[in-house]
């Protein structure tokens, strides 16, 4: 299911540069430069010594994407530049906060950093918000609220100490969200250590509200890494960075989906979309031919060729695996060359093979929620 989300919901077109195969550890100096070492060390795993160098498991991807940008000179014509990846991150969360795949010490997140000019902030924030809310439509997420997360000015230890930068960043993000017509509340002390952020919080079926998506405005890290671009007048300027996470931790998002759907995923998202159930060995050959046709059509299909009674196979597929569609194939179906289609509700319909394939592929294409 994670692969489906990555391939279908988080398209490469949202990024100019897609990072793959990045090391899960980095030199300690990167986190010291970014400020993570000073402001986030209690949530990081201890440093490791290897061949005379000190490395840490990366808790975030910001420093690495900064270094990709810094790898070559840039002009204002190059901006906005979007660097994204499906990243493996590691955070030493306290044991009391751990909660299955919803909150662990190792997780995958869809993460991107958008490098832009100050004039491009509004359009980039708008694009991020549109991408977030369009993605929510795909998953039928309607119960959410937007929060402008600000720093606590009195907490100098938690936040980068630059009042002018913070005032500028908070006012800029507040102004953009207001202009975009996004209704939001403000919460003090919830910002990232380097800048304010828009948090989109959801209320899961079980448990407390949590942040699913973020868009963070950052004037701090580009300056710390001495990032520049050449402007129209030939002068060097520092870019602004937006930290974008459309679905945040994919592990947490899968936990959210499991709770919301009770494991009954829509056809387009289900790990197995169709399960083929031959009644006996006599219809196994026909079942195999149907399975091949579904595979050729791009359907995720599984063939249950175990020597079990058909009632057992149906219960396992419907109640345990919660597969959207089951094809019960007996002698009657094999002789007629058609299908007995059973859905999760237990309703059974006789359909032609091509008719069923067209139905399933249309549900996948349109991301329908009708089963």
Task: Please place each PLM-identified region on the residue numbering.
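NTP/phosphate- and nucleic-acid-binding module
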Residues: 1-371
């Amino acid at each position: 299911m994670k692969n489906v989300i990555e391939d279908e919901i988080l398209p490469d077109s949202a990024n100019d540069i897609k990072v793959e195969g990045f090391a899960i550890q980095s030199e300690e100096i990167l986190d010291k430069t970014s400020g993570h070492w000073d402001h986030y060390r209690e949530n990081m795993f201890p440093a490791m010594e290897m061949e005379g160098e000190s490395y840490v498991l990366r808790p975030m991807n910001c420093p690495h994407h900064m270094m990709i940008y810094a790898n070559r000179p840039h002009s204002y014509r190059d901006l906005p530049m979007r660097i994204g990846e499906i990243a493996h991150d590691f955070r030493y969360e306290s044991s009391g906060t751990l909660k299955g795949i919803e909150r662990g010490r190792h997780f995958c997140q869809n993460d991107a950093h958008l490098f832009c000019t100050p004039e491009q902030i509004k359009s980039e924030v708008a694009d991020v918000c549109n991408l977030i809310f369009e993605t929510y439509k795909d998953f039928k997420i309607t119960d959410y609220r937007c929060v402008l997360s600000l720093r606590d000015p009195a907490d100098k230890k938690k936040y980068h100490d630059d009042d002018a930068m913070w005032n500028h960043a908070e006012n800029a993000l507040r102004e953009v969200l207001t202009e975009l017509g996004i209704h939001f509340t403000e919460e003090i002390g919830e910002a990232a250590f380097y800048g304010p952020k828009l948090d989109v919080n959801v209320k899961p079926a079980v448990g407390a509200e949590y942040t699913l998506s973020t868009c963070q405005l950052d004037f701090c890290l580009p300056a710390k890494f001495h990032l520049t671009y050449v402007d129209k007048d030939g002068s060097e300027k520092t870019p602004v960075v937006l930290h974008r996470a459309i679905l945040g931790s994919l592990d947490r998002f899968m936990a959210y989906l499991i709770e919301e759907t009770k494991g009954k995923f829509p056809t387009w998202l289900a790990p197995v979309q169709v399960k083929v159930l031959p009644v006996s060995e006599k219809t196994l050959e026909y079942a195999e031919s149907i399975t091949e046709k579904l595979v050729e059509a791009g359907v995720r299909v599984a063939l249950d060729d175990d020597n079990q009674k058909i009632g057992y196979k149906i219960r396992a597929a419907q109640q345990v695996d919660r597969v959207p569609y089951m094809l019960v194939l007996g002698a009657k179906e094999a002789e007629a060359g058609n299908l007995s289609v059973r859905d999760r509700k237990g309703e059974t319909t006789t359909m032609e093979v091509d008719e069923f394939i067209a139905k399933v592929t249309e549900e996948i294409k349109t991301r329908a929620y009708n089963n």
